[in-house]
A protein has these predicted regions:
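N-terminal secretory signal peptides and thylakoid transit peptides that target proteins
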Residues: 2-20
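Boundary at the C-terminal end of the N-terminal hydrophobic targeting segment
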Residues: 28-30
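Catalytic-pocket segment enriched in acidic/His residues
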Residues: 32-54, 97-98, 151-265
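Extended, compositionally biased flexible segments
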Residues: 33-134
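A generic structural signal for short beta-strands and their flanking turns/coil linkers
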Residues: 80-82, 89, 115-119, 138-144, ...
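Short, structured patches in soluble enzyme cores that scaffold and shape functional sites
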Residues: 117-119, 123-125, 143-148, 180, ...
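Hydrophobic, well-structured mid-protein blocks that either form specific transmembrane helices
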Residues: 129-163
Length: 265
């Protein structure tokens, strides 16, 4: 496959054949069934820290406005609005190795490109209507991530009462570090989360300030969608989101996880 220059065009994407699929209802492992397909399909994996194994990504869920101050700066009332979720395409993943500054391309169609640092939960179990007190049993591990956003497109579509997927779902819009198993880190209930641009702190909060905890997010999300192994959940960003331009270096931090750094190019 080395002669195919289009293969592995993004970090964390590997070549797979046929449909994948983690045992999801109605789906099968194509290679196990001997199914032949007319072309290869890229599959997305995230390295697991301290292991030669990789985490297969099924879906990327994101929660919106999950810190009170961020909800207010985005024009919402955090005291009364229920949680809402959106998705990014699986191949929006851009893996960012620890202790490196990875180039991140400034996307097309935008003049107002924003950062949002987030804790990411990775699931190895699934279910529907999961009670809050059982929800963390589904979590395999955690990672540090960024929900990169074309804010001008998001706002333009929102003002027109149209879906704002174009502002959130695009190539490389989900940078993420390695996944650390819960067995090594425990669950991230509290701890510092922050982001700096060119050494200046822009976002800083505590994970305990989430409006909806990771367990509550899993429970609420499972009411609307059956969850499966391989699903990951971006758990929301603190206040003070803002723009970056080419040449800026973003550094993300969560206590207990290695830093994540990208350079906008």
């Amino acid at each position: 496959m080395k002669d195919n220059q289009n293969v592995n065009r993004r970090d964390a994407i590997k070549l797979g054949f046929g449909a994948t699929v983690l045992g999801a209802s109605g789906l099968s492992h194509a290679h196990d069934q001997g199914v032949k397909t007319p072309f290869p399909v890229e599959q997305v994996f995230i390295p697991i820290a301290g292991s030669d194994q990789e985490f297969p990504v099924r879906r990327i869920y994101c929660i919106g406005r999950n810190y009170a101050a961020h909800a207010i700066e985005m024009g919402s009332d955090p005291t009364r609005e229920p949680p809402f979720f959106f998705q990014k395409p699986t191949d929006a993943i851009q893996f960012v190795a620890p202790n490196k500054i990875v180039d991140h391309p400034y996307p097309s169609l935008t003049k107002n490109y924003h950062y949002e640092v987030e804790l990411v939960a990775a699931l190895n179990k699934g279910g529907k209507n999961i009670p809050v007190d059982k929800a963390l049993d589904l979590v395999y591990g955690y990672a540090l991530g960024l929900d990169m956003t074309r804010r001008d497109l998001q706002r333009f579509m929102g003002d027109q009462k149209k879906p704002w997927e174009i502002g959130k779902s695009f190539d490389h819009s989900a940078p993420i570090g390695p996944i650390f198993p819960v067995a090594k880190t425990g669950h991230f209930i509290k701890g510092n989360i922050q982001l700096s641009v060119n050494g200046v702190v822009k976002q800083k909060a505590d994970l305990s300030q989430m409006i909806w905890s990771v367990a509550e997010q899993i429970s609420k999300l499972s009411e609307a969608n059956e969850l499966f192994p391989g699903d990951i959940i971006y758990s929301g960003t603190p206040e003070n989101v803002g723009p970056v331009v080419r040449g800026d270096v973003i550094r993300c931090q969560i206590n207990g996880l290695p830093d994540l750094s990208i350079k906008i190019v």
